């Protein structure tokens, strides 16, 4: 075994109880995210809202982007076929480009906006039409061993 330091933080009972409560709430939320049966329509509705708030300034209303500055999402290989890469880009951003990480969005918001951009502007018909569900985002966040 390697060196495994243990850190103990002593807190008042009230603070500990609040921590336990929050951990339980997180576990319940995670269970709901990973077991809910998400419809494409539900993800699209949420995704459009997230897109309009976070993405439209660069990628434009119809996903056409701005030539030479911000890439189009309409008809792009990533939006048509590369689901895992699409998740990675939103989670990590693109180094050396204007695309920042959006990892501060919730799992539901991320799944919804990715699904929206994979389904809108004819992308569903032109590509694989694969949706992203919150569990896909949870799985992406799991540590890789």
Regions from the PLM with identified roles:
Residues 7-13:
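Short beta-strand edge segments in extracellular beta-sheet folds
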Residues 81, 85-112:
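Active-site/pore-lining binding-face segments in mid-to-C-terminal subdomains
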Residues 8, 73, 90, 113:
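Hydrophobic, well-ordered secondary-structure elements that form the walls
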Residues 40-66, 74-92:
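Sequence/structural segment immediately N-terminal to covalent heme-attachment motifs in c-type
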Residues 2-5:
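Extracellular and select intracellular beta-sandwich modules with Ser/Thr-enriched
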């Amino acid at each position: 075994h390697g060196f495994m330091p243990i850190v103990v933080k002593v807190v008042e009972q009230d603070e500990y109880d609040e921590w336990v409560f929050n951990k339980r709430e997180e576990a319940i939320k995670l269970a709901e995210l990973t077991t809910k049966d998400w419809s494409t329509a539900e993800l699209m509705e949420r995704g459009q809202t997230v897109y309009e708030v976070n993405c439209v300034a660069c990628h434009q209303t119809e996903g056409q982007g701005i030539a030479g500055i911000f890439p189009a999402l309409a008809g792009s290989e990533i939006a048509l076929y590369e689901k895992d890469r699409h998740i990675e880009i939103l989670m990590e951003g693109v180094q050396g480009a204007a695309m920042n990480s959006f990892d501060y969005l919730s799992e539901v918001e991320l799944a919804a906006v990715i699904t929206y951009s994979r389904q809108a502007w004819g992308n569903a018909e032109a590509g694989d039409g694969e949706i992203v569900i919150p569990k896909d985002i949870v799985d992406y966040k799991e540590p890789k061993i």
